[in-house]
Structures are given as C-alpha cells and as structure tokens.
C-alpha cells in the first residue's frame, strides 16, 4: 500500500511576472527580462525580481538613509539603484552629490538631489549606462518599517511578546453599553 505524499511544499512561491497594469513598469520588465537573459549578470536578475514585487515589498527610501549608505568611502562614484521610491527627509541638512537610479523620486527629493549637483536616472537610462550593473550599488528601504508589522508576531500578552494589540480604543469608554435615547 502506498503512502499519501504531501505536496504542499513543492512549489516555489514567488512572482514570475508583474501584476501591475502600469505600461511603463511593464516596459521596464520587458527590458530587464531581456538583459537578465542575455547578460550573465546577477544584477539584472535581482532588478527584474524586484520589479515584480508588490508595493509593500518595494518600500520607500528616505534621502537621509540613502546619503548614509552612499557616503561610505568604498561607494564613491557608484550609482545608487533603488527599485522603489526615494522620499525627502527634512532632518537631512546637506544632501551629498550622488547619482541615483530609481523608479520614482518625490518632487522635493528630486529638487534637493539636483541642487546638490547630483544626477537622477531612470531605469532605461541605467540599462544604457550600466547594462551589467557595473559600478552600481543596490539599496532597499526597510520592509518592516510599516505600522502594520508591529501587530505581527506572538500573541500580545504571551510571554516575551512585544506584539502590538489591535485595540479599538483605550480607557473605560469601550465598556459602556450603547445607550438609546428615548425619542
């Protein structure tokens, strides 16, 4: 008598194509799918995989974090590649000169990078400048920075759990029954 084999772990769960209907994103996917196939560079495969990702998995990156990553001495003259959005950070006083390639850059962040003498590339411009990803550095935003992530983990109240509970309101108000006014 044979055994019933459990096949629930057989498939690899990841996106194999972009879910968005955005034509510009789909054109980038076409371009990087071609580059990933024709060049033997790991960089293009990583960019392609990140282009497939959902918005949650392409978190925004602040200018201050980007500047902190790019001011390392080994990263001088490299192109920062962000498959996502670069946002402004008012806490950063002086923006260093840097070359950035990103899917989207907010208006204020764009102005500050360009004022510092920096350069902002689109991904199709990046493909022409660095088709194999030479002299580039891939940078991501924090995926666990979302407020929703605080609610994940062992149940709130469990030992050593720092999970935030889902609470409608704090205080004695929630214990009150809804009163009907006599009309």
Curated annotation (Swiss-Prot):
Sample GO molecular function, one term: RNA binding
Keywords: Cytoplasm, Ribonucleoprotein, Ribosomal protein
InterPro entries linked to this entry: Ribosomal_eL18 (IPR000039), Ribosomal_eL18/eL18-A/B/_CS (IPR021132), Ribosomal_uL15/eL18 (IPR021131), Ribosomal_uL15/eL18_sf (IPR036227)
Location relative to the cell: Cytoplasm
Disulfides per UniProt: none
Keyword Cytoplasm: yes
The organism's place on the tree of life at top rank: Eukaryota
GO biological process: translation
Protein name, UniProt field: Large ribosomal subunit protein eL18
Species this protein is from: Plutella xylostella
């Amino acid at each position: 008598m044979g055994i019933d084999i459990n096949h629930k772990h057989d498939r690899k769960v990841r996106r194999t194509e972009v879910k968005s209907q955005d034509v510009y994103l789909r054109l980038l996917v076409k371009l990087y799918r071609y580059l990933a196939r024709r060049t033997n560079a790991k960089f293009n495969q990583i960019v392609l995989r990140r282009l497939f990702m959902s918005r949650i998995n392409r978190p925004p990156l602040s200018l201050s974090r980007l500047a902190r990553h790019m001011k390392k001495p080994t990263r001088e003259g490299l192109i920062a590649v962000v498959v996502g959005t670069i946002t402004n950070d008012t806490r950063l006083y002086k923006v260093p000169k840097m070359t950035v390639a990103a899917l989207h850059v907010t208006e204020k962040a764009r102005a500050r990078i360009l004022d510092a003498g920096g350069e902002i590339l689109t991904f199709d411009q990046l493909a022409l400048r660095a088709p194999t990803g030479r002299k580039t550095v891939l940078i991501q935003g924090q995926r666990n920075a979302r407020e929703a992530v605080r609610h994940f983990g062992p149940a709130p109240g469990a030992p050593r759990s720092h999970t935030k509970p889902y609470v409608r309101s704090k205080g004695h108000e929630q214990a009150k029954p809804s009163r009907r006014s006599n009309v």
